[in-house]
Amino acid sequence: MKYTLFTLFFSICICNAQAQIVSIPDLNFKNALLNDSSVNTNFDNEIQVSEAQAALDLLFYYEDISDFTGLEAFVNLQTLAIEGELITSIDLSANLEVTNLSIVVTPITNLDLSSNSQLESLTLVANELTTLDLSTNLQLEYIYFLNNPLTDLNLGANIVLEELIVSSNVILPTIDVSENTSLKKIEVVNNSMTSFDVSNNINLEILRTYGNNLLTLDVSTNLMLKELNTMFNQLSSLDLSANTALDWFNARNNQLQTLDARNGNNDLFINFNVINNPDLQCILVDDPTANYLTSWNVDQNTLFGNSNQDCQSLVVDQNEIYAPHLYPNPALETLFIEAKKPMLEFCIYTTTGAIFMQDKPSQPSFFYQIDVSTLPSGVYYIKVVGSTFRSIKRIVKY
């Protein structure tokens, strides 16, 4: 009788011990946990449920893990960072306490975060995600998405979001941040976006939109803005006059024709860069005679004025001084152009504004000739762009 009772008691103990061990079928996942002394606290060859429940942070870095079954036992997990693993999906439905999640360089195609309502920080880099539902993640404060083929991103529910970084997601035409009024930093770069509206983001301090195809950008309501980096876009006009806190600005390599920088604090700029905007002839500034303007990075032929009238007068004066001489005019076969400053390019327009011919010397030149023999007879305009001038002249073709 004693032997029978002992056998029964021993069998129950074995079953109970087995029941307290987390089932982890992926050996690489299991080995990573066993080698983590903060998880495998008794240094045996299994992960007990009690050990899983005690773990708050897990980091996996190129462990060749393809299956995270067993992660559901880590019910108190707060931080999960995965990089370079082989997963295409992951089940986080039992990890209700996760506040920080990072998944980097994986082939994951599906990510369900509907159960993770405590999530505050989300980093997704170089994955295969095309869609992502964040409608239940109301506590999100930080989002960093880099190089994911997302076709849409709905942030309407994430109203406490303070920092948004979305980079190299080239399929996104735009991102709606109209509901995210708590945002202090937005970095949406290299996404090929054609439009971006930040008019509701009144708490914004840092805005980076470089490397897109933006045609317009209105920052008139972003009164707390300190940094604006919108280089390498297609912007033709910018108005910074309302941005009195702005002290860092880069809009190089755009198509700027007008720029109003009269924000009342031009002397506070630690960076001001608008080079490679060949059509920007004059910038509106607080004081066109101020010494600090010499530290601004502008094209050689760009001038400074305090009013539109100033700029118009300066541009006319500058262009008249270096205006090229064209002859013969009318022309039959060849048009000769001479200038006091090096010429860079030429463009002939019809009277309706259509471009008929473009030409460019192999190097900056004081003298150039254009073959106009193929031009139909009539009146045209020729724009001559030089190193320090831009001139439009009327020509007649016989």
PLM regions with names:
Residues 320-327, 331-398:
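C-terminal outer-membrane/trafficking sorting elements
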Residues 68-71, 90, 111, 132, ...:
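Canonical leucine-rich repeat
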Residues 4-13:
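Sec-dependent N-terminal signal peptides
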Residues 41, 46-90, 97-98:
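LRR N-terminal entry segment and analogous cap-like coil->beta motifs
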Residues 18-65, 164, 291-313:
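The feature captures the LRR N-terminal capping module
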Residues 57-64, 81-87, 97, 102-107, ...:
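Concave beta-strand-loop units of leucine-rich repeat
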Residues 306-327:
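Residue-level detector of functionally pivotal "anchor" positions at catalytic/ligand-binding pockets or at interdomain
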Residues 51, 70-73, 94, 115, ...:
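C-terminal capping segment of individual leucine-rich repeats
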